[in-house]
Amino acid sequence: MQGTPYIYQGEEIGMTNAYFKSIDDYKDIEAINAYKEYTESGLMTEEEMLNCLKMVSRDNARTPMQWDDSANAGFTTGTPWISVNKNYTQINAKAALEDKDSVFYYYQKLIRLRHENEIIVEGVFHGLLEDNDDIYAYERTLGDEKLVVACNFTNKEVPCDLFEGKEGEELITNYKNHVTGVPVSYTHLTL
């Protein structure tokens, strides 16, 4: 995988989609027009269209930055142009900085690894387990070095023998005490 990584619109603290419950919560004219078009034509029910917008609306990335658990997530003392995500009391910059296992610090570790390991930037990409629908895995090679990455984006632990019997240094994982398989929502880099 080539390219420049970027961290965008609250991802560094784990901000999520807003999942607005009413079309009145949306401000994006594209979302509002699509809602009207699809519901009035009968192509989708109001509920189906709202479920679609919860996943794809640009307004998901336009909610105010969640700085802390105070009113309006610490973004403003006024009225924001769009509603603050309802999870701001749990997901916010202040809470992230106070939790050494937060998404924020995980991103910092990943950025540090990228700066310290040329293989992450310059290594040749090879897909692994390409027939496995549950695990996204690949390796990068650079000279004699090999970096293996395994990611499980499912909601269940998945059996995997990718690392079995192999020596290497675990560079980062978001699960500390796993025994077998690839845990739920798991990322693992081994050099």
Regions found by a protein language model. Give the residues of each.
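Beta-strand-rich binding/interaction modules
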Residues: 157-175
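Loop/helix patches that line or flank the sugar-binding groove of alpha-linked glycan CAZymes
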Residues: 1-147, 153-158
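Short, intrinsically disordered, charge-balanced linker/junction segments flanking boundaries
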Residues: 178-186
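Residue-level signal for pocket-adjacent positions within structured domains
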Residues: 60, 115, 167, 174-178
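Conserved small/polar residues in nucleotide/adenosyl-binding loops
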Residues: 187-191
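Intrinsically disordered, low-complexity segments enriched in small/polar residues
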Residues: 121, 125, 163-166, 179
